[in-house]
């Protein structure tokens, strides 16, 4: 645990008592503060009270008497679509609002790190898609190379749950837009922006607000080095804003296009990763044989991870060795098994159209299981990527809407995962891939995308 200093003797309100909220309360108490907690969920409050934390509704102004700050969990909206009443009240009273990510970065100014000759290096990864794989891959490569590394944030442990670590250690953080938009301190040594596509737009008031939340990672003090995916206009803009000259090597551009210019570029094209600096190739990796990184989208993730690891001084061969032993993450292009020549792939994390499109590009002869709770924008952007789909099997609340969105693709409304898997198996032929890539949220039928993926795996197991 990282004790949160700077609030000793003060009362700090904590809103939301899930994994990050409870860890925040513990870290505040360890630093000498008195947490005052609240969660609308009775069971969450009971868990906090069992650890000795006081819980009280933060509904009225007098509840904030003597409160120095409010720390909120990332899933609680503070602006769009409607501000949470407790957060709005705190803001109206002039009480600072922060989250655990902001507290983590503020902790570097406290005595807990004084014994180290060098503070931990922090790599923070954000973007619409590929954050988890990129973060986990960076962590895996660094660990395999013998670097003391911890993985936290939106993946792995809560950021305040990690240990201060070893002298010169590394912390890899996956950060969602929910986490970056409110943190009062964001000072990573290396910041990674994988890509941008429409997602969570209701939470951010539109695409501009969504990009602004991601961009904050690069504007508060600025990282020592930025790794920027430049295949979208927003990435190009961000790289341009951060560069002071064409050859500025503080910015590493990651692209699927042919490398050009005098800067530091890492490209992933047709299964090959190449590094160029000052117009010369300085490293390359054949990504095609690596089973844990299937498809062009994972090759882009690998390029981002490569750039981050090179920033820390790893040699290309060290990175290649780490890539080769990477097993991939559950629910992200996860090969579940093969039966009668049919391959089953679980990409339940493909919760938006862009990530589903990338999954569809990674495989041939697809029997596609899709649907759930449809997000803004519809399926029009998927149309160019449906050529390899033999048939779609549609599930969830938005199954009928999905059917209307893909009129030229053979499809069947199955509603449930069990029916979809059974129908796909009955019609599959050797060489087909049965792919779960929902292009939708899971909350109509499941608690989260993990449960949806686990249900797919359980249904597939009946046929293996």
Swiss-Prot record:
HAMAP family: MurD (MF_00639). Cell wall formation. Catalyzes the addition of glutamate to the nucleotide precursor UDP-N-acetylmuramoyl-L-alanine (UMA). NCBIfam families: murD. This is UDP-N-acetylmuramoylalanine--D-glutamate ligase. ATP binds at residues 127-133. One of its GO terms (molecular function) is UDP-N-acetylmuramoylalanine-D-glutamate ligase activity. The keyword Cell membrane does not apply. It catalyses: UDP-N-acetyl-alpha-D-muramoyl-L-alanine + D-glutamate + ATP = UDP-N-acetyl-alpha-D-muramoyl-L-alanyl-D-glutamate + ADP + phosphate + H(+). It holds the Pfam family Mur_ligase_M. GO terms for biological process: cell division; cell wall organization; peptidoglycan biosynthetic process; regulation of cell shape. Its main location: cytoplasm.
């Amino acid at each position: 645990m990282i004790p949160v200093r700077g609030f000793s003797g003060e009362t700090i309100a904590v809103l939301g008592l899930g994994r990050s909220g409870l860890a925040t309360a513990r870290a505040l108490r360890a630093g000498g503060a008195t947490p005052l907690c609240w969660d609308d969920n009775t069971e969450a409050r009971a868990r906090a009270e069992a650890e000795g934390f006081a819980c009280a509704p933060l509904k009225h102004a007098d509840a904030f008497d003597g409160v120095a700050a409010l720390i909120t969990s990332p899933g609680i909206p503070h602006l769009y679509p409607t501000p949470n009443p407790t957060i709005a009240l705190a803001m109206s009273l002039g009480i600072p609002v922060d989250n655990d990510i902001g507290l983590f970065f503020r902790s570097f100014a406290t005595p807990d790190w004084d014994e180290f000759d060098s503070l931990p290096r922090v790599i923070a990864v954000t973007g619409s898609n590929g954050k988890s794989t990129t973060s986990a891959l960076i962590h895996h490569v660094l660990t395999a190379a013998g670097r003391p590394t911890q993985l936290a944030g939106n993946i792995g442990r809560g950021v305040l749950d990690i240990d201060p670590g070893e002298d010169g250690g590394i912390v890899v953080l996956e950060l969602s837009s929910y986490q970056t938009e409110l943190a009062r301190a964001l000072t990573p040594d290396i910041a990674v922006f994988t890509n941008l596509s429409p997602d969570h737009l209701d939470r951010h008031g539109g695409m501009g607000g969504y990009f602004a939340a991601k961009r904050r990672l690069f504007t508060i003090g600025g990282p020592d080095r930025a790794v920027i995916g430049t295949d979208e206009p927003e990435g190009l803009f961000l790289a341009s804003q951060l560069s002071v000259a064409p050859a500025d090597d503080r910015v590493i551009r990651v692209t699927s296009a042919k490398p050009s210019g005098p800067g530091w570029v890492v490209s992933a094209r047709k299964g090959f990763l190449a590094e160029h600096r000052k117009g010369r190739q300085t490293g390359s990796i054949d990504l095609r044989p690596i089973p844990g990184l299937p498809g062009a989208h994972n090759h882009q993730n690998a390029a981002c991870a490569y750039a981050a690891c090179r920033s820390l001084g790893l040699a290309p061969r060290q990175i290649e060795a780490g890539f080769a032993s990477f097993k991939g993450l559950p629910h992200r292009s996860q090969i579940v098994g093969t039966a009668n020549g049919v391959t089953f792939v679980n990409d339940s994390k493909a919760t938006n159209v862009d990530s589903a499109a990338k999954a569809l590009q990674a495989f041939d002869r697809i029997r596609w299981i899709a649907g759930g709770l449809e997000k803004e924008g519809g399926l029009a952007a998927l149309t160019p990527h449906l050529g390899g789909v033999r048939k779609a099997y549609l599930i969830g609340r938005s199954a009928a809407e999905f059917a209307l969105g893909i009129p030229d693709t053979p499809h069947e409304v199955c509603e449930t995962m069990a029916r979809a898997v059974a129908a796909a198996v009955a019609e599959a032929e050797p060489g087909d891939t049965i792919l779960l890539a929902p292009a939708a949220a899971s909350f109509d039928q499941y608690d989260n995308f993990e449960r949806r993926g686990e249900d797919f795996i359980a249904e597939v197991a009946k046929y293996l």
